A protein has these predicted regions:
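Low-complexity, intrinsically disordered or signal/transmembrane-proximal segments
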Residues: 8-11, 16-19
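ATPase nucleotide-binding head domains, primarily ABC-like/P-loop NTPase cores
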Residues: 399-402, 406-622
Length: 622
């Protein structure tokens, strides 16, 4: 099995960054797919054998009974029938066990098929996070964090909706958290990345369906509000129930021995049935209405909690999660198992004959209500914390899998400084793979970098490279660079403005609103890196240039730092007016018979543009 350590021994330092190391991962996942496909097929063949054996052993039972009834000395046939019955039970047990093994093998097969597809740049089998797209967010919309082909989709292995929400929250929030917190997250991710079998087993539980955390929490919160008389918890009620069951047993024995009329135990059983039904049926109906559909989800949660609790993880954040669900003061496993058994009891109430029998003889509904109340009092206050802990672990599994799948990435150095620090060597965009061209770039606090260049020269991709790698770094993930040193700061982008015709907002008005939002954000959080692609898109060139100058002059009065890509070469003269704050960089192209794109950033102002050249070439071809 490949490990992170083996992969990180080799780092590409060339401008062209091949991902040939990922061929090892592709080979590993391919072998896992082949293994579990073969295993599932073997188990399915065994299942057919069990079905045949089960049928034959079952048919032996009536045959043996028939021979026993017709034979003079049929004791041997009776024994044979008993053995056939025991054989049938054993085969059914093995068949049930084999069925679970088939399901587990198929789930793991699905896990590894998805990872194999990931290595082949097919991310369609992972949730895209479209529900989290927000054009007004400070940076996620511009940096392609959510949606088809997004960073979230590449990372997302979550199997609970709570885990998905937690992962989305991590990627959408880069508030100035302590460096120690980032290091703690990194250690947890690194440890989980090295536990590939644990991650695969965890993900296997969500291959058939996603566990809806919101539905479970909603149901459990409703349970919390269900008002049931606490009398069922009292010793008096327990004594009364015990007395009723005991009297029924005594009167039944007396009636069976001829010492009492049979009418008395029957009448007592009927009275007990109506008493229990009157006292408990309404309460159990409320409970069943709320949680009756949760059984499948709860069983899955029990499996996840068992898996987490049994893991031997040492990293601080991982230990926090384990302690939260299986510490001395809490017992999530016992809680969910008790709730699952309660749901089993509720399911069994659908059998009317059984309900009448067990309530008449054993007051079963009373004990079901009593068990529920005890569970509600003991465990209900902890449920939300346990589910939140599982959601955190679910999100960490996704982050760790991303780290494992991208062995060419390296850990960033996070420095604890009260200013914007961003020093990158050989940085490139994580989506580009072997097509990526790396660049060196350094951002100083409260400085502004104006980047010029022709269309398609690489400006926008470079801006996203800066933003996405920072986002990875502060989430404790490795970055796509030879080396990256960053401090912790806020991030705000303006790259992909959209109009909103439903609210009467034009494209240009949307651009102004975005810049206003940016200014307000910088005033709230002075240590901010702003990334802008073409200020004031949607107006004429001269107005755009003057407006851009005015905006940059105003933003320069704030304690912010920025990178601004533009086609307006005149805007580069800001560096002449304020050389201590503004700096020019460019992506140059070479024009000859064809255009050569280097995708390398260099100091200075771009000299060559390509719009007219490309248009003329297009017209000539027609």
């Amino acid at each position: 099995m490949p490990t992170l350590k083996n992969f990180h021994n080799k780092q590409s330092t060339t401008n062209q960054l091949p991902h040939n190391m990922n061929k090892d991962l592709l080979s590993f996942y391919h072998r896992r797919v082949a293994h579990y496909a073969a295993l599932a097929e073997r188990l399915r063949k065994r299942n057919k054998l069990f079905m045949l054996s089960s049928f034959l052993s079952f048919m032996l039972i009536p045959a043996c009974i028939g021979f026993y009834a017709s034979a003079d000395k049929g004791q041997l046939w009776l024994m044979a029938g008993l053995l056939a019955f025991l054989l049938y039970l054993a085969i059914r047990y093995l068949d049930n066990k084999n069925g679970k093994q088939i399901e587990h093998a198929e789930n793991l097969l699905s896990v590894y098929e998805k990872e194999e597809a990931y290595q082949q740049n097919n991310f369609s089998r992972f949730g895209s996070g479209e529900q989290y797209i927000d054009p007004r967010h400070a940076f996620t919309y511009d940096l392609d964090i959510f949606g088809s082909g997004s960073l979230f989709q590449r990372m997302n292995r979550t199997i609970t909706t709570g885990g998905s929400d937690t992962l989305a929250g991590y990627l959408a929030d880069v508030r100035m958290r302590p460096v120690g917190e980032i290091e703690k997250r990194r250690e947890a991710i690194r440890e989980l990345a090295e536990c590939e079998p644990l991650r695969a087993a965890f993900c296997a539980h969500g291959q058939k369906h996603i566990i809806n955390t919101a539905e479970i929490l909603s149901a459990l919160n409703t349970i919390k509000d269900i008002r049931i008389s606490k009398f069922a918890l009292s010793r008096l009620s327990l004594g009364m129930a015990g007395l009723g069951i005991g009297l029924l047993a005594v009167t039944t024995v007396l009636a069976a021995t001829g010492n009492l009329s049979p009418v008395i135990p029957v009448a007592w059983a009927v009275i007990q049935l109506f008493a229990v039904q009157t006292a408990c049926a309404r309460s159990l109906g409320k409970i069943n209405k709320v949680v009756g559909k949760m059984h499948t989800h709860l069983r899955a949660y029990i499996s996840l909690i068992r898996l987490i609790a049994a893991s031997d993880l040492k990293a601080a954040e991982n230990r926090e999660i384990i302690t939260a669900i299986a510490g001395k003061e809490t017992d999530a496993i016992a809680s969910f198992e008790q709730l699952s058994r309660l749901l089993d009891g509720l399911d069994q109430r659908s059998n009317i004959m059984g309900l009448i029998l067990f309530n008449s003889l054993f007051a079963s509904d009373y004990f079901l209500v009593r068990r529920f109340l005890k569970w509600q009092v003991r465990y209900m206050p902890c449920i939300e914390d346990w589910i939140a802990a599982v959601s955190r672990f679910d999100a960490l599994v996704s982050l760790a899998t991303y780290r494992y799948n991208e062995p060419q990435a390296v850990d960033a150095e996070i420095v604890d400084e009260e200013q914007v620090v961003y020093r990158a060597e050989g940085i490139y965009h994580p989506f580009l793979g072997e097509k990526a061209v790396s660049n060196n770039f350094c951002i100083d606090d409260r400085h502004y970098y104006i980047i010029t260049g022709a269309n398609m020269a690489g400006k926008s991709t470079f801006l996203r490279t800066i933003g996405v790698n920072y986002l990875l770094a502060v989430n404790g993930l490795p970055v796509f660079a030879d080396r990256l040193t960053v401090s912790v700061f806020s991030l705000f982008t303006g790259m992909r403005t959209t109009d909103d015709l439903n609210h009467g907002i034009s494209y240009f008005n949307a651009e102004l609103l975005r810049l206003k939002q940016l200014m307000e954000s910088c005033r709230r959080s002075p240590r901010t890196l702003i990334i802008l692609d073409e200020i004031l898109k949607g107006t004429n060139s001269l107005d755009k240039l003057n407006g851009s100058r005015l905006f940059l002059q105003e933003i320069a009065t704030l304690a912010a730092t920025g990178i601004i890509a533009t086609h307006d070469l005149e805007l580069s003269k800001m560096a002449d007016a304020m050389p201590d704050r503004f700096h020019n960089h460019c992506f140059e192209i070479q024009l000859s018979t064809d255009i050569t794109y280097t995708y390398k950033i260099t100091p200075g102002v771009a000299r060559n543009q390509n719009a007219t050249y490309l248009l003329r070439k297009m017209l000539l071809t027609h």
